[in-house]
Amino acid sequence: MATATENGHAPVPDENTAPDAAPAEQKEQTEQTEQKEEKTQTNGDIVTVFHDPDNFNVKHPLMHEWTLWFTKPPSGKGDNWNELLKEVVTFGSVEEFWGIYNNITPTSELGLKADYHLFKKGIRPEWEDQQNKHGGKWSYSFKDKRSVAIDDLWLHAQLAAIGETLENDGDNEVMGVVVNVRKGFYRIGLWTRTVGKSIPGDKNGTEGRSAAKGKEILENIGRRFKEVLRLKETDVVEFSGHTDSAHSGSTRAKAKYTV
């Protein structure tokens, strides 16, 4: 494994290396140190780590566990995409997320055709995954790579995903987010479980939804995604189904919805 660079970031992965996540313990120690600031009790007294050490070692769990994946740049035309896709690490708390994020290569330093994928645990970032095959994705391409703050935008996309702010409770659509590094652009995508189709209720009392409601849910997610990416009102974010993309032979198919 290569050594860290002078600016403190992990090295840019070469063709045969996926980015390593530093041990979570290192970040936890940093977080615990930062949290040794004074806090006020309801009675006005000051609480420090000396008064209540347990509260300064607490992890803040996320609603779901998430897995970070990395697609390393291909070395030749014969490379199998599945072999390029590497699982990096799974985490379930805010502290673990920051420990990972602060110790891997920034998106802006990745090689061409590299990708980061952040998906709920148990879901592979592939169209063929059982939980993805009926879904689709919102995506936007940033074509001026020199002027876009891709590291900040990717961070905000990840925080919105793990913070569960991209959809309403019960929508159950967001599967994960992805960033692609390409020669002429960066692209950030948000994968969903469905393409907005109707879902019947079941005998267990689970409420179904109409196709119109499904479309409304996806468009609401698209609008929130657009806000997270700090896009202008005139910018257009497109949604396409994975099946349509597969049939077109491209990661981009004709847009099913736009916001």
Walk through the language-model features, giving the residues of each.
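Intrinsically disordered, low-complexity regions enriched in proline, serine, glycine
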Residues: 78-80, 99-101, 109-113, 200-201
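Intrinsic disorder/low-complexity signal
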Residues: 1-61, 250-259
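Glycine-rich loop/turn
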Residues: 62-88
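Beta-strand elements of modular eukaryotic interaction domains
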Residues: 56-59, 77, 87-88, 127-131, ...
